[in-house]
């Protein structure tokens, strides 16, 4: 009996010391599952509400005092700075092409690439979208893809914006590194700055005077689109190469008035026949253009 009493007392003292230590140092407590915690596992998971530098509070002069007149001024300016409608950005990768010759002028779409672009144009037409802006990379394969799509959707070719910021390139060194693709550091510096400038030009919440939801179509390239997706969703940009998207596929991102960003489609190409699904430059056919 004496042994049982001693054991019980020792166990109780140990448990008491354990819980006392937990109260003193709550940071050492571990949840049964990390998903039960309301705090991000990684600080980088916290959403930056002013990612586009258009958060209303960042645009309005701060309160100078607590007087009613000053508070009314601040609230009125804050309301005027708020976006009211969403922006939809639909990104389309160019169709299949052949990397033939030393000049971009010779990098035409293959016959299959033209068919891919035609299916994508029909799909965009079926969605019934009224386009506010169409932007295309200035590279040959993106220009040809854009021309084919324009035949299917209601948008005048003369209004298309041709943007060199969207040209293909090396946005940022990928993680994990890959052995088959290692651009020089100078290329990352040159291309990365340009592609980031393209992101900042087209990805931002709506202006306060925008009265309806807007739709922007961007015809570009695989590397650029994947980088844009990571940046827009505030994922580590170095992870862009882990994503794979097919030729002429559709990626749809929405920027809400609050600045939150969501993705509706990522590399959608299910509207094409299986024989048209490709994502790499063909090596076994001749350029038919």
From Swiss-Prot:
Q: Name one GO molecular function term.
A: kinase binding
Q: Which positions make up the signal peptide? A: none
**GO BP field:** positive regulation of mitochondrial fission; positive regulation of mitochondrial fusion; protein dephosphorylation; response to anesthetic; response to heat
What is this protein's record name?
Serine/threonine-protein phosphatase Pgam5, mitochondrial
* Alphabetical list of Pfam families matching this protein: His_Phos_1
Q: Does the keyword Hydrolase apply?
A: yes
Q: Give the InterPro entries listed for this entry.
A: His_Pase_superF_clade-1 (IPR013078), His_PPase_superfam (IPR029033), Mito_Ser/Thr_phosphatase (IPR051021)
Question: What topology does it adopt in the membrane?
Answer: Single-pass membrane protein
Where's it mainly located? mitochondrion
Where found in the cell? Mitochondrion outer membrane
Q: Kindly state which reaction or reactions the protein catalyses.
A: O-phospho-L-seryl-[protein] + H2O = L-seryl-[protein] + phosphate; O-phospho-L-threonyl-[protein] + H2O = L-threonyl-[protein] + phosphate
Q: Which PANTHER family is this protein grouped with?
A: PHOSPHOGLYCERATE MUTASE-RELATED, SERINE_THREONINE-PROTEIN PHOSPHATASE PGAM5, MITOCHONDRIAL
Q: Which keywords annotate this record?
A: Hydrolase, Membrane, Mitochondrion, Mitochondrion outer membrane, Transmembrane, Transmembrane helix
Family to which this protein belongs: Belongs to the phosphoglycerate mutase family. BPG-dependent PGAM subfamily.
Give the Enzyme Commission number: 3.1.3.16
A Gene Ontology term for the protein's cellular component: mitochondrial outer membrane
Q: What is the lineage of its organism?
A: Eukaryota, Metazoa, Ecdysozoa, Arthropoda, Hexapoda
Subunit structure comment from the entry: Interacts with Pk92B/ASK1.
Q: Which organism is it from?
A: Drosophila sechellia (Fruit fly)
The primary gene name is Pgam5
Q: Which residues cross the membrane?
A: 7-23
**Function according to Swiss-Prot or TrEMBL:** Displays phosphatase activity for serine/threonine residues, and dephosphorylates and activates Pk92B kinase. Has apparently no phosphoglycerate mutase activity.
């Amino acid at each position: 009996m004496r042994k049982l009493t001693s054991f019980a007392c020792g166990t109780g003292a140990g448990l008491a010391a354990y819980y006392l230590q937990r109260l003193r140092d709550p940071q050492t407590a571990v949840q049964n599952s990390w998903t039960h915690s309301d705090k991000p596992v990684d600080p980088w998971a916290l959403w930056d509400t002013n990612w586009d530098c258009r958060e209303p509070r960042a645009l309005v002069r701060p309160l100078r005092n607590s007087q009613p007149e000053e508070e009314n001024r601040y609230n009125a300016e804050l309301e005027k700075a708020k976006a009211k409608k969403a922006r939809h950005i639909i990104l389309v990768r160019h169709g299949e092409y052949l990397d033939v010759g030393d000049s971009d002028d010779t990098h035409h779409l293959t016959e299959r690439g033209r068919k891919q672009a035609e299916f994508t144009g029909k799909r965009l037409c079926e969605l019934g979208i009224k386009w506010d802006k169409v932007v295309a990379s200035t590279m040959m394969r993106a220009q040809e893809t854009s021309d084919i799509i324009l035949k299917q959707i209601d948008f005048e070719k003369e209004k298309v914006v041709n943007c060199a910021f969207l040209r293909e390139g090396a946005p940022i060194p990928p993680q994990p590194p890959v052995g088959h693709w290692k651009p020089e550091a100078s290329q990352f510096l040159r291309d990365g700055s340009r592609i980031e400038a393209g992101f900042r030009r087209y990805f931002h919440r709506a202006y306060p005077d925008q009265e309806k939801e807007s739709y922007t179509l961007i015809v570009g390239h695989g590397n650029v689109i994947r980088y844009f997706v990571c940046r827009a969703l505030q994922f580590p940009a170095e992870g862009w190469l882990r994503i794979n998207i097919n030729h002429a596929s559709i990626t749809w991102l929405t920027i809400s008035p609050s600045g939150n960003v969501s993705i509706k489609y990522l590399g959608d190409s299910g509207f094409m026949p299986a024989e048209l699904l490709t994502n790499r430059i063909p090596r076994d056919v001749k350029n038919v253009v």
